[in-house]
Amino acid sequence: MIELENVCFAYEKEIALRYVDLHIEKGDSVVIQGPNGCGKSTLIKLLNGIIFPSEGKYFYQGHEINEKALKDSRFAKWFHQQMGYVFQNADTQLFCGSVEEEIAFGPVQMGLSEAEIKKRTEDCLHLFGLEKLRD
């Protein structure tokens, strides 16, 4: 169901994931734990299609997950309906003032630029047909 093959990811000069292999079958329970800075959040972002491997491959249900695949709106909608995660401090996410703020919450927590947050929020509003409900 989920497979990573020799996945690497780096933030500029800082290596976050180095040659990670992972195989998770449907029904498996998985815990990702480790000290600060070991790559847990990076791995979760990668599994959710927020970032992509600089090396290696990521497969979900036999489909390679990469930037090109997720540019296909039908595929992206299918994938994002299947995959998601809960933030470590989920209580702070509840009850944003608008649908737009709720969608932007994740990218804000990831520390993305204002322009990238706006782009991703607009993409999600469009993908799920929520433009009229943004406010």
Task: Name every feature range the model reports, one short phrase each.
Residues 48:
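Helix-to-loop junction immediately C-terminal to a conserved catalytic motif
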Residues 14-15, 77, 132:
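Short coil-to-beta microelement around the adenine-binding A-loop and adjacent beta1/P-loop entry
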Residues 91, 97-108, 118, 122:
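Short helical segment in ABC ATPase nucleotide-binding domains corresponding to the A-loop/adjacent helical element
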Residues 115-134:
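Conserved ABC ATPase "signature" region
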Residues 56-68, 79:
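Conserved ABC transporter NBD signature motif
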Residues 33-35:
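The feature captures the beta-strand-to-loop junction immediately N-terminal to the Walker
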Residues 24-26, 78:
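Conserved hydrophobic segment flanking the Walker A/P-loop of ABC-type ATPase nucleotide-binding domains
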